[in-house]
Amino acid sequence: MSRKVLFQLVLPLIGLSILFWLLAFAPGERKNQPALLEMSVILRDGDGAVSTMRRGMEQAAEDLNVELRFLTPTADNSAAEQAHLLERETAGGTQAILLLPADRGVLGEAVSAAAGRTALVTVETDMTEWGAGAAVTMDHQALGEALGEAACNGVPTGDTVLLLDSLPGDNGIRERMLAARETLERAGRQVRIYQWSADTASFTDILRIERPGAVVAFEAAVLAEAAEMARSNESFPLLYGCGSTPAIAAALEEGRVTAIAALNVFSAGYLAVDAAAALARHEDWTGVPTVAFSIVRQENMYDNDNQKLLFPVT
């Protein structure tokens, strides 16, 4: 037998041996990986403020062999449309669902119905009382109080603080605002609530009329918009709020934002997928820890712990 023919016979055998080794012994132990799990994620809106949380979800999905499908209402923060999406995904047999609720009052019935048919985890707003299997949230009461106290440090007694109400309804974002209002009023500050919208002219008018000493936003997207307005307005009030996006970190560094409640939203996204996957697969599960936050100012934004909150993904 010629050397050439022998080579042609042996080469495929070597290839098959390598393939067998990869399948049987390669890192990751593919043969022990859990079966692929389909999971739907129902967002409140399509804003980029959830991008860090989404990266956390995607990292968990890669680690846990989960296929994610992101769904967004056509109208931002439409709880009614979220309820429709929840009913549709449940009826379609989705194995697990993550939901960022816009309004408990509107979504309660749909959540209760879905929770009996699929693994359902809510993010940001707790709906375990309606039957959700778990909730990945932060302490909204403590967060709102902390922002209220921060604003008190910058605004004298008797002066006005303007709170931006960006998500009407029964939800975690509103819990933050109500806690901040209570803290400010108890400390002797005047509180005004402004219904946030895309109408920047209206907001400018409110600032001119009320002349607040500080403005507080309770969502990252709203804080980022207000910080951008402050760029071209030297008389803009002190600005406080929730969020830890790159745009907000830049505004904090430049002094356009006075202080923020920085949230570990990457961790929130990861924990949500992890919890839903464990519930869907009927695995042993110890519960979800409360998502951490920290009040961050320009002078301490580069502390190690705060860096992890501001820049959780490199």
Regions found by a protein language model. Name each.
Residues A135-T160, S244-I248, L263-R281:
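Hydrophobic alpha-helical segments within soluble ligand-binding/sensing domains
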Residues E38-G56, A60, R69-A80, R104:
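Extracytoplasmic "Venus flytrap"
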Residues S267, L271-T314:
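Hinge/cleft segment of the Venus flytrap/periplasmic-binding protein
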